[in-house]
């Protein structure tokens, strides 16, 4: 429909001698009520929450080719290998030399540092003869280390025996189809009796930069994405950046309330990273295809690393942990017995010219995911509305039930939205059983008659695009049924249970097998209801080892993928990590920011670019926007759709429940905001609904142009003043849609 309209319009414009076409937002929902957070233009305050212009300063080679290297002819070109360190060099089509080390032979670098930056691997191990399990670090220049290299097709295979610990590691490096692949199989890691492997750092100085010798930046998948520009040493930076892929490992802590065991900042949602040497010149995008659940990402800053900036991945095979020995809180330190079992596999993708930037990395990642989902044929973007049905609280003598929204109320909401032109809706019912939102998990058997009937449910399905039940099968409330605390709870390595405490209940993480059984039985019990599918809590972002049954993180990922892919119902997940992307039909609570650490220079929408055109992406709830217009512009910029959590009754009735943090939810209070917000976003994104983002350019700091596959671009002006883009005026905190 849009394409045919464009053709007619272009024909008219050609008659009058003009080809330019643009659409400027004009509010299509009339309301007498002012919405201050939307209607008032707040000052633009620049920070690393935005993306900034990057100079395309030329990047020169900073080192010469290796001397006396092993030169391996591959299908993708010459792979030069320094046999002493297993460092490699590859020359790209622009004549730029990519190297896994730096120009280390210079004044000021100690020999110990030179050895580190040259080494392909750096390992840490625990000394079991030491009561404190002292850490020993080794690189390939440790005295007594032996390396045996064998040429294989398109690369080499190295057998390494480290000199001090006698730990043996096998390393495969191949260069094929323009991709460098590094592989460490678990069955080629052999430990001795005394030293036990802790971690392996893999090519930790690949793409490293000394001070400001090379222009460009590091890309980190922190939250939605972040950039760190190469720069001179800053003494104020106190520590390097380190974060585990997929969030902190919960299996080794002693925390009795895991609500307190949070990530510091945003999670890493995908095991990727990259570095750009000369913007739009050359870049490397790294993708960890095996080993990510036990991996972590490191960024070393120049002030903490002798003037060198480098980004790399590291893999954890074994940890120490504290074991409680009595009820007084006394503990002893123990070493994990069996090492974690996993292979390490990293692919490095070489990007050039217009692809040598974070957008090129996102597009590369999208192609590697190779996920194709169908989108609806509606012309407008979707709107997500999460509905709270029942919620429970403790009363003086017995539990009290608050009926926040009946199914009849939901139908009325949908009718009202339809009159305002909002017809593409994802409706999720939370608290649809008698135990309410908080106390139901993990047991869902039937719809509570207190919120409505099956017939009313069918009416909602007919009025909405998709209707979902909101469920949770990993976290089990002590106020619920379907499990026993004696036999069904997962255990940490210390034999403690995983617990979350709220004001009204305690939730436990269940054994993996129990979670599978509960999900299957729930789907069977609810199959008679006319819904499209399920929003499943925790499956998207909750990884934990079940030491009670020796289930690893890799085991959990495998069974979750297999379980959900076997279901015919629509599956939606919250805040999900990349290992679940293939089994999802929509993404709820897409991260919209990076951690915004002071060391970061930019926030970039890497994740939403990678998933654009792949599946619908929905933002966290817009109920709580303090500066709505800024947040809505971000939705348009990142191609993410608006969401609200709604009730019929006032949110004051959630007081003294576990949902009392929801301070505004009444549809009556929010309906003007819903309609205004939706149409503001829809009037931009409806022209590119279901399309992939192919480019994102910062025209000027605070002004961004996003280009789509269908040749439509949207210019977003975050500034508090109008911006003139070659004759096109974009009003303050507004946008223009253009057909190119």
Cite the ranges covered by each PLM segment:
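N-terminal secretory signal peptides that target proteins for export/translocation
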Residues: 1-5
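Sec-dependent N-terminal signal peptides of Gram-positive bacterial secreted proteins and lipoproteins
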Residues: 7-26
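N-terminal accessory beta-strand-rich subdomains and adjacent acidic, glycine-rich linkers
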Residues: 27-377, 714, 719, 727
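Active-site-proximal substrate-binding groove within the catalytic cores of carbohydrate-active enzymes
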Residues: 74, 81-92, 269, 275, ...
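Glycine-rich, histidine-containing beta strand-loop boundary motifs that form or position
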Residues: 83, 92, 186, 204, ...
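Terminal accessory/anchoring regions of large secretory-pathway or extracellular enzymes
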Residues: 347-426, 660-691, 696-698
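Aromatic-lined carbohydrate-binding/catalytic grooves of carbohydrate-active enzymes
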Residues: 378-459, 467-517
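Short acidic catalytic loops
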Residues: 422-433, 466-471, 524-546
């Amino acid at each position: 429909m849009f394409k045919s309209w464009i053709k007619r319009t272009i024909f008219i414009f050609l008659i009058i001698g003009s080809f330019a076409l643009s659409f400027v937002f004009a509010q299509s929902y009339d309301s007498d009520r002012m919405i201050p957070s939307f209607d008032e233009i707040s000052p633009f305050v620049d920070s690393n929450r935005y993306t900034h212009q990057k100079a395309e300063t030329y990047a020169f080679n900073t080192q010469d080719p290796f001397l006396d290297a092993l030169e391996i002819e591959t299908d993708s070109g010459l792979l030069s290998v320094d046999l002493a360190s297993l460092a490699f060099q590859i020359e790209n089509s622009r004549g730029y030399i990519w190297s896994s080390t730096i120009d280390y032979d210079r004044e000021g670098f100690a020999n110990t540092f030179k050895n580190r930056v040259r080494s392909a691997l750096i390992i840490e191990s625990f000394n079991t003869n030491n009561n404190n399990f002292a850490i020993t670090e080794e690189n390939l220049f440790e005295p007594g280390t032996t390396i045996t290299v064998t040429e294989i097709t398109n690369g080499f295979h190295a057998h390494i025996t480290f000199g001090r610990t006698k730990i043996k590691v096998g390393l495969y490096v191949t260069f094929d189809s323009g991709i460098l692949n590094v592989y460490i199989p678990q069955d080629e890691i052999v430990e001795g009796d005394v030293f036990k492997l802790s971690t392996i750092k893999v090519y930790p100085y690949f793409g490293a930069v000394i001070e400001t010798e090379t222009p460009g930046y590091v890309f980190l998948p922190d939250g939605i994405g972040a950039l760190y520009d190469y720069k001179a040493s800053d003494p104020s930076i106190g520590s390097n950046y380190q974060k585990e892929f997929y969030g902190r490992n919960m299996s080794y802590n002693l925390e009795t309330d895991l609500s307190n065991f949070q990530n510091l900042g945003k999670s890493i949602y995908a095991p990727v990273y990259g570095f750009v040497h000369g913007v739009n010149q050359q870049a490397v995008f790294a993708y960890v295809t095996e080993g990510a659940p036990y991996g972590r990402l490191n960024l070393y800053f120049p002030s903490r690393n002798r003037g060198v900036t480098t980004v790399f991945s590291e893999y954890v095979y074994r940890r120490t942990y504290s074991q409680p020995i009595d009820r007084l809180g006394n503990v002893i330190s123990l070493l994990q017995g069996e090492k974690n079992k996993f292979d390490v596999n990293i692919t490095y993708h070489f990007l050039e010219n217009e692809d040598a930037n974070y957008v090129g990395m996102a597009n590369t990642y999208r192609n590697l995911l190779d996920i194709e989902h169908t989108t609806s044929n509606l012309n407008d973007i979707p709107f997500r509305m999460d509905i709270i049905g029942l919620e429970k609280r403790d009363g003086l003598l017995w539990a009290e039930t608050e009926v926040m929204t009946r199914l009849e109320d939901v139908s009325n909401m949908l009718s009202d939205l339809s009159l305002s032109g909002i017809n593409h809706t994802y409706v999720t019912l939370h608290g649809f059983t008698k135990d309410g939102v908080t106390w139901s998990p993990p047991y869902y058997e039937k719809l509570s008659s207190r919120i409505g009937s099956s017939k009313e449910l069918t009416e909602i399905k007919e009025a909405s695009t998709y209707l979902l039940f909101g469920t949770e099968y990993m976290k089990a409330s002590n106020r619920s049924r379907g499990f026993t605390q004696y036999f069904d709870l997962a255990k940490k390595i210390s034999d403690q249970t995983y617990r979350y405490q709220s004001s009204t209940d305690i939730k436990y993480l269940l054994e993996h097998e129990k979670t599978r059984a509960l999900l299957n039985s729930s789907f069977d019990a609810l199959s008679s209801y006319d819904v499209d599918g399920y929003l499943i809590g925790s499956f998207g972002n909750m990884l934990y080892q079940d030491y009670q049954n020796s289930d690893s993180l890799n085991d959990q990922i495998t069974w979750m993928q297999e379980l959900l892919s076997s279901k015919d119902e629509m599956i939606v997940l919250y805040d999900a990590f990349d290992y679940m992307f293939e089994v999802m039909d929509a993404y709820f609570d897409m991260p919209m920011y990076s951690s915004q650490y002071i060391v970061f220079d930019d926030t970039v929408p890497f994740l939403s670019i990678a998933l654009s055109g792949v599946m619908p992406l929905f933002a966290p709830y817009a109920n709580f926007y303090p500066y709505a217009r800024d947040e809505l512009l971000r939705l348009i910029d990142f191609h993410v759709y608006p969401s609200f959590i709604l009730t019929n009754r006032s949110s004051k009735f959630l007081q003294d429940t576990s949902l009392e943090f929801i301070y505004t939810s009444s549809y009556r209070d929010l309906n003007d905001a819903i309609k205004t917000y939706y149409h503001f976003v829809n009037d931009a994104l409806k022209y590119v609904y279901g399309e992939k983002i192919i480019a994102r350019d910062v025209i000027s700091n605070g002004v961004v142009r996003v280009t789509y596959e269908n040749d439509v671009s949207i210019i977003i002006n975050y500034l508090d003043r109008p911006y003139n883009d070659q004759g096109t005026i974009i009003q303050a905190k507004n946008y223009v849609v253009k057909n190119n």
